[in-house]
Amino acid sequence: MAFSKGLIFAMIFAVLAIVKPSEAALDAHYYDQSCPAAEKIILETVRNATLYDPKVPARLLRMFFHDCFIRGCDASILLDSTRSNQAEKDGPPNISVRSFYVIEDAKRKLEKACPRTVSCADVIAIAARDVVTLSGGPYWSVLKGRKDGTISRANETRNLPPPTFNVSQLIQSFAARGLSVKDMVTLSGGHTIGFSHCSSFESRLQNFSKFHDIDPSMNYAFAQTLKKKCPRTSNRGKNAGTVLDSTSSVFDNVYYKQILSGKGVFGSDQALLGDSRTKWIVETFAQDQKAFFREFAASMVKLGNFGVKETGQVRVNTRFVN
């Protein structure tokens, strides 16, 4: 069916007209005049931290997800607890979030270059893009202009989707943040550079159900390997666990290939193969890395726009409100 140029432009303007004001407020060139070196400063900080600690990319990407999923992308995950309030970073799902120092370091440098200009929320969003790119993944232009939140509550971290969710629960959780089924499967691909402690998946390895000792959706040999990494002994190291795909330092589509082989570490990951709503997406990305990269960049922009505040502050210190 052919469309005239006039009709196409009309359709584009119609779409732009329904964009939420909070999303429209963001701009890829937001700091071009006020802090032109902002992205360079953040990139150099992230790159140096990654050279020192290869775990930084996975940690900062996870930080971005956990920040955006609570009150939107507002850097509330960075705030410290006080005597009267337990903050997000001390909520159970966030106890294992690490590498806050990287964001703090970037923010200190930005305050010297451009005082009270670049928000902590934008630093997290840009850093998340940078760690993906530095790990071999896609690049995208980060929309900027977020404001930093002043509220951070540990009890709200219960809204983060746990690794035990089934597909219906995952779909509902992501939909509450304006994300589609495809966005959910795509963003789950961030686990390609992830690591998990045993506590997040060991329920799949033993006494799984009344009828199965091991989760039947898991590759048996893979389950035995994980059992060795997570022995049920009193002297098991507190950091015992496993990477979430076999090329954990590289951002690629191996995560999806492993799901096809029954080697998804989390129950929520492997469940994506058992549901017709998500199976085709897993299969597509396992076969086409370029498609995964393209969709991941788009979904990250979409997640980064969630809950953006039109009013707020540009925090001077990442850990405290002004």
Swiss-Prot record:
<feature type="glycosylation site" description="N-linked (GlcNAc...) asparagine">
    <location>
        <position position="166"/>
    </location>
</feature>
<feature type="binding site">
    <location>
        <position position="72"/>
    </location>
    <ligand>
        <name>Ca(2+) 1</name>
    </ligand>
</feature>
<feature type="glycosylation site" description="N-linked (GlcNAc...) asparagine">
    <location>
        <position position="155"/>
    </location>
</feature>
<dbReference type="InterPro" id="IPR019793">
    <property type="entry name" value="Peroxidases_heam-ligand_BS"/>
</dbReference>
<feature type="binding site" description="axial binding residue">
    <location>
        <position position="191"/>
    </location>
    <ligand>
        <name>heme b</name>
    </ligand>
</feature>
<dbReference type="Pfam" id="PF00141">
    <property type="entry name" value="peroxidase"/>
</dbReference>
<keyword id="KW-0376">Hydrogen peroxide</keyword>
<feature type="binding site">
    <location>
        <position position="67"/>
    </location>
    <ligand>
        <name>Ca(2+) 1</name>
    </ligand>
</feature>
<feature type="binding site">
    <location>
        <position position="161"/>
    </location>
    <ligand>
        <name>substrate</name>
    </ligand>
</feature>
<dbReference type="InterPro" id="IPR033905">
    <property type="entry name" value="Secretory_peroxidase"/>
</dbReference>
<feature type="active site" description="Proton acceptor">
    <location>
        <position position="66"/>
    </location>
</feature>
<feature type="disulfide bond">
    <location>
        <begin position="35"/>
        <end position="114"/>
    </location>
</feature>
<feature type="binding site">
    <location>
        <position position="247"/>
    </location>
    <ligand>
        <name>Ca(2+) 2</name>
    </ligand>
</feature>
<dbReference type="GO" id="GO:0020037">
    <property type="term" value="F:heme binding"/>
</dbReference>
<feature type="binding site">
    <location>
        <position position="76"/>
    </location>
    <ligand>
        <name>Ca(2+) 1</name>
    </ligand>
</feature>
<feature type="disulfide bond">
    <location>
        <begin position="198"/>
        <end position="230"/>
    </location>
</feature>
<feature type="binding site">
    <location>
        <position position="252"/>
    </location>
    <ligand>
        <name>Ca(2+) 2</name>
    </ligand>
</feature>
<keyword id="KW-0106">Calcium</keyword>
<dbReference type="InterPro" id="IPR000823">
    <property type="entry name" value="Peroxidase_pln"/>
</dbReference>
<feature type="binding site">
    <location>
        <position position="245"/>
    </location>
    <ligand>
        <name>Ca(2+) 2</name>
    </ligand>
</feature>
<feature type="binding site">
    <location>
        <position position="192"/>
    </location>
    <ligand>
        <name>Ca(2+) 2</name>
    </ligand>
</feature>
<feature type="glycosylation site" description="N-linked (GlcNAc...) asparagine">
    <location>
        <position position="207"/>
    </location>
</feature>
<feature type="site" description="Transition state stabilizer">
    <location>
        <position position="62"/>
    </location>
</feature>
<dbReference type="GO" id="GO:0006979">
    <property type="term" value="P:response to oxidative stress"/>
</dbReference>
<feature type="disulfide bond">
    <location>
        <begin position="68"/>
        <end position="73"/>
    </location>
</feature>
<keyword id="KW-0560">Oxidoreductase</keyword>
<dbReference type="InterPro" id="IPR010255">
    <property type="entry name" value="Haem_peroxidase_sf"/>
</dbReference>
<feature type="signal peptide">
    <location>
        <begin position="1"/>
        <end position="24"/>
    </location>
</feature>
<dbReference type="GO" id="GO:0042744">
    <property type="term" value="P:hydrogen peroxide catabolic process"/>
</dbReference>
<keyword id="KW-0408">Iron</keyword>
<keyword id="KW-0575">Peroxidase</keyword>
<dbReference type="GO" id="GO:0140825">
    <property type="term" value="F:lactoperoxidase activity"/>
</dbReference>
<comment type="function">
    <text>Removal of H(2)O(2), oxidation of toxic reductants, biosynthesis and degradation of lignin, suberization, auxin catabolism, response to environmental stresses such as wounding, pathogen attack and oxidative stress. These functions might be dependent on each isozyme/isoform in each plant tissue.</text>
</comment>
<dbReference type="GO" id="GO:0004601">
    <property type="term" value="F:peroxidase activity"/>
</dbReference>
<feature type="binding site">
    <location>
        <position position="74"/>
    </location>
    <ligand>
        <name>Ca(2+) 1</name>
    </ligand>
</feature>
<keyword id="KW-1015">Disulfide bond</keyword>
<keyword id="KW-0479">Metal-binding</keyword>
<dbReference type="GO" id="GO:0046872">
    <property type="term" value="F:metal ion binding"/>
</dbReference>
<comment type="similarity">
    <text>Belongs to the peroxidase family. Classical plant (class III) peroxidase subfamily.</text>
</comment>
<keyword id="KW-0732">Signal</keyword>
<keyword id="KW-0964">Secreted</keyword>
<keyword id="KW-0325">Glycoprotein</keyword>
